[in-house]
Amino acid sequence: MFQYEELNKQFIGGKWQEGSSPNVLENKNPYTQKTFTTFRKATADDVDEAYRAAALAKKKWDAVNPFEKRTILEKAVTYIEENEEAIIYLIMEELGGTRLKAAFEIGLVKNIIKEAATFPIRMEGKILPSTIDGKENRLYRVPAGVVGVISPFNFPFFLSMKSVAPALGAGNGVVLKPHEETPICGGTLIAKIFENAGIPAGLLNVVVTDIAEIGDSFVEHPVPRIISFTGSTKVGSYIGQLAMKHFKKPLLELGGNSAFIVLEDADIEYAVNAAVFSRFTHQGQICMSANRVLVHSSIYDKFLELYQAKVESLKVGDPMDPDTIIGPLINSRQTDGLMKTVEQAIEEGAVPVKLGGFNGTIVEPTILKDVKPFMSIAKEELFGPVVSFMKFDSEDEAVDIANETPFGLSGAVHTSNLERGVAFAKRIETGMIHVNDTTINDEPNVAFGGEKQSGLGRLNGEWSLEEFTTLKWISVQHEKRSFPY
């Protein structure tokens, strides 16, 4: 068992050390607002040291037998299982996740590591024919090199591991910069896990800092070949452009504005349960959350009535209480921004069915009906327990409303006719959409990613293996060939 006091340092070159900056990052419980640990921030020099350590350790990792690599990754899963209760506590303490959310996140983490553990023995190549006599074309799948990972605050343990584990499994070195609000769950906890599993010193490095301290050095550094970023579309756009400027491949998992669509033949009670889960899991702080609930006009009032009743039953408050479903937002800035969004929506004509209170970082559920596509709340990502209800009269209208957003991450459609649901889903401009399910889905072997402004690239399974590797063509001329001169 470990304590969080052990995890408040940088992890660079296989060593736990203080950041070089005199400036301190306070790690606060978002519910109590109490500081439970502090970090000395990493500087650009620390980032440089971390990247160089990763590049050096990657060469040692190259020499490790693929089956030994698999065993090391499997040991990481074992360590998580042995310390699961402590990790649950950390998730509740650091990011205000409920016990239910923490257990859900840990399950996702274990699954993605198990998938990544198969990567070392899936580094397959090809032998291809040649137009030239006596020539053999070999195609090798090789690690990209070093990967820089920048993770968010909402599911920090999983969304860090979603890039870290596959990158390691594919043979790369990694430098991880967790969000400054969640430096342990998104960063040093992961370092502890892989240190215990036995990866080479320096293969994984964690730098805890903020942009004010390091500027663009994390992305601009010459060592990393890939920058994997999960976060807002605004920041992701900047990071993607900066990475491309320096000829690095950006992997971007960005914002969403998912529509949960209920056709007139849906199982209403089942759809209500799925819709509530799609919106209020982890206080709505999920990129796949159903910001918009689109309901056919013939069942709109009935659905809204049942939805409100279900939401009223959700306990709001202390995430340490096992009965709590809706805990705190990560910080007061998120609360203030959400409050302004709700106020603006009401000014624009949205009708509050349930207007929740705002108290510090605790936000009670808010349900707005008769929201129109032109309203700002219908166009933006909502990172909190606020939901917009919209009415439609036909499938074509529902498709138009669902697609009237710059985002294209996830979605859901409910109907008693499954093939009708699939045909409808194909018309929605998202990377993922689910028939008779929630908008929140992530499986370790299925392609995950968005369209439009929701990101670039796909993660999980074979897609992560492709993203974190490159192909090298080596030709072998077995027989002497003739040349024109």
Swiss-Prot record:
Keywords: NAD, Oxidoreductase. It comes from the Bacteria. Its EC number is 1.2.1.28, 1.2.1.67. It catalyses: benzaldehyde + NAD(+) + H2O = benzoate + NADH + 2 H(+); vanillin + NAD(+) + H2O = vanillate + NADH + 2 H(+). Induction: Transcriptionally regulated by SigD; part of the yfmT/yfmS operon. Pfam families: Aldedh (PF00171). The active site is at 253, 287. Optimum temperature is 37-40 degrees Celsius. The keyword Transit peptide does not apply. Optimum pH is 7.0. NAD(+) binds at residues 231-236. Gene3D superfamilies: Aldehyde Dehydrogenase, Chain A, domain 1, Aldehyde Dehydrogenase, Chain A, domain 2. GO terms for molecular function: benzaldehyde dehydrogenase (NAD+) activity; vanillin dehydrogenase activity. Disruption phenotype: Loss of conversion of vanillin to vanillic acid. Belongs to the aldehyde dehydrogenase family. A benzaldehyde dehydrogenase able to act on substrates with 3- and 4-hydroxy and methoxy substitutions; converts vanillin (4-hydroxy-3-methoxybenzaldehyde) to vanillic acid in vitro. The physiological substrate is unknown. This is Benzaldehyde dehydrogenase YfmT. It comes from Bacillus subtilis (strain 168). The lineage of its organism: Bacteria, Bacillati, Bacillota, Bacilli, Bacillales.
